[in-house]
């Protein structure tokens, strides 16, 4: 389940080892909680995911001073970050959703008009694929990401520190 408020992944049901569907994405039960609790569960993050030191950056000789929302820094695009935006639905099917957001030059202090499309696809092998596409009309900075948290046990009260994930060396 994905909401167009912040492009958030609200739930992701996957089969466990017994074939029972379990929600493995952490989130809230009420949309109001996504607005009122500042944890970014499942959100699309932008214009710039991460912290911009002191809310300042220089691009092509121009210094930009962004609003600060995190101890004197700009975090995840600030208070007007993409995670606080209502996205337009462009395409929807049983296995695919495309959302779109246009932000004007100067929005949240960032240069350039930016048109972002994000496509969520459920694959036949039970994967969630998130693809980002963005265009702009002038040099800007852009760092898009998704802020989902996963609990692979499917039990939100179970400590996820009990799990290890093998990876190639």
Where does each model-flagged region fall?
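Aromatic/His-enriched, Gly/Pro-containing loop or helix-boundary segments
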Residues: 39-46, 108-110
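Extended, loop-rich substrate-binding clefts of extracytoplasmic carbohydrate-active enzymes
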Residues: 67-125
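Short, surface-exposed beta-strand-loop junctions and turns on beta-sheet-rich folds
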Residues: 8-9, 17-20, 72-73, 105-106, ...
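Hydrophobic residues embedded in beta-strands of well-ordered beta-sheets
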Residues: 10, 97, 127-130
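Acidic, contiguous internal or C-terminal segments within carbohydrate-active enzymes
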Residues: 1-3, 105-154
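Conserved small/polar residues in nucleotide/adenosyl-binding loops
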Residues: 163-169
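Beta-strand-rich N-terminal accessory domains
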Residues: 1-33, 37, 41, 49-64, ...
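Residues that act as N-cap/strand-start positions at coil-to-secondary-structure junctions
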Residues: 6, 39, 51, 81-84, ...
């Amino acid at each position: 389940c994905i909401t167009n408020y912040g492009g958030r992944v609200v739930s992701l049901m996957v089969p466990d080892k017994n074939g029972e569907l379990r929600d493995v994405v952490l989130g809230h039960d009420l949309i109001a909680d996504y607005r009122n609790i500042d944890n970014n569960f499942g959100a699309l993050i932008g214009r710039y995911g991460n912290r911009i030191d002191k809310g300042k950056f220089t691009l092509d000789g121009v210094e930009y001073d962004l609003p600060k929302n995190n101890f004197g820094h700009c975090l995840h695009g600030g208070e007007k970050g993409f995670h606080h935006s209502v996205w337009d639905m462009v395409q929807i099917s049983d296995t695919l959703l495309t959302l779109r957001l246009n932000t004007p030059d100067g929005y949240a202090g960032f240069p350039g008009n930016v048109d972002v499309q994000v496509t969520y696809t459920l694959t036949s092998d039970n994967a969630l694929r998130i693809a980002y596409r963005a265009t702009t009309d002038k040099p800007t900075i852009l760092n898009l990401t998704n802020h989902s948290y996963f609990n692979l046990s499917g039990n939100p009260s179970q400590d996820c520190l009990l799990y290890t994930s093998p990876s190639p060396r």
